[in-house]
Amino acid sequence: MDRHRVAIIIPTLNESNTIANIVQSVLPSGRVIVVDDGSTDNSAQLASNAGAEVVRHKTNLGYDKAIDSGFAYASDLGCKIAITIDGDGQHDTSLIEKFLSEIN
């Protein structure tokens, strides 16, 4: 699977404690798109430094709008597969590769 056609969308709000590690752990699987939903910390900068493409909302628009923004951005990039995970570290990121191998 061409990793440039896979988008991993991570909506985030003030996740500076976890976002860099999450981005780094999923980066080999696809294009990482972090949607910063109005964070007041440095989540967006940390995500960018870790290798993510960052979409920023100036204010908190809510989880659903963050997901929508991520899907729109991924579509504009030509991604054919989109996977969402949360920015707080609650998901097992190793399952992304397993999922991709199953659909390939």
Model features per residue range: what roles?
Residues M1-N104:
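Structured catalytic core of nucleotide-sugar glycosyltransferases
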